[in-house]
């Protein structure tokens, strides 16, 4: 009912990125991502700027962060992340959302968005508080065309760092990605990946 009168809303004053994973997961059961404002803030500096930004970028991305708080690499990262979000916002804000792994069921979370024509998708994966040497399961994607082939590319990387995602820059069928999945989770705390999939 409220969305008849407002184009977006503030889910919570709590902007701790760990808490936001649970908050945004819950709100997404009812509200579309384009209606949920999510800002990068200074809350929980134990987490990286990358993690905080990747959490906020699964909704309507914003920043409430003093630029003087950021070092050169963090500032460059934020600029690149905003550019990627702007380039992909039609997928994130207007695409079909698939909730893949619930933070309420374990130590990880994953959400993805796909375009209606199934030619582009964005996958988000988050490691929250993994247990030591826990068994990591592949993330099985949804909403792809099983007959199409998709190029997998990890984006939103820190400057001078390389992706260690085994599937990075490789091509898989939609059928494989949905039935077998990709190994995107890690045993790192407060670790995130943003993965772009493009049909070839």
How would you label these PLM feature ranges?
Residues 1, 64-66, 72-74, 130-133, ...:
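Flexible loop/turn segments at secondary-structure boundaries
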Residues 102-146:
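Carbohydrate-binding surface patches
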């Amino acid at each position: 009912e409220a969305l008849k009168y407002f184009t977006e809303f503030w889910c919570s004053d709590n902007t701790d990125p760990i808490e936001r994973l649970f908050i945004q997961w819950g709100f997404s059961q009812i509200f579309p991502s384009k209606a949920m404002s999510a800002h990068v803030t200074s809350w929980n500096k134990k987490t990286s700027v990358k993690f905080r930004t990747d959490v906020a970028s699964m909704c309507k991305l914003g920043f409430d962060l003093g630029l003087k708080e950021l070092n050169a690499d963090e500032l460059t990262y934020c600029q690149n992340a905003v550019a990627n979000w702007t380039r992909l916002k039609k997928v994130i804000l207007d695409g079909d959302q698939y909730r893949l792994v619930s933070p309420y069921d374990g130590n990880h979370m994953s959400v993805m968005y796909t375009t209606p024509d199934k030619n582009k998708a964005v996958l988000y994966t988050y490691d929250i508080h993994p247990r030591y040497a826990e068994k990591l399961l592949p993330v099985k994607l949804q909403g792809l065309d099983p007959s199409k082939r998709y190029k997998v590319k990890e984006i939103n990387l820190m400057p001078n760092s390389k992706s260690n995602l085994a599937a990075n820059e490789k091509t898989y069928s939609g059928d494989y990605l949905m039935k077998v999945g990709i190994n995107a989770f890690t045993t790192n705390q407060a670790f995130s990946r943003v993965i772009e999939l493009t049909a070839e």
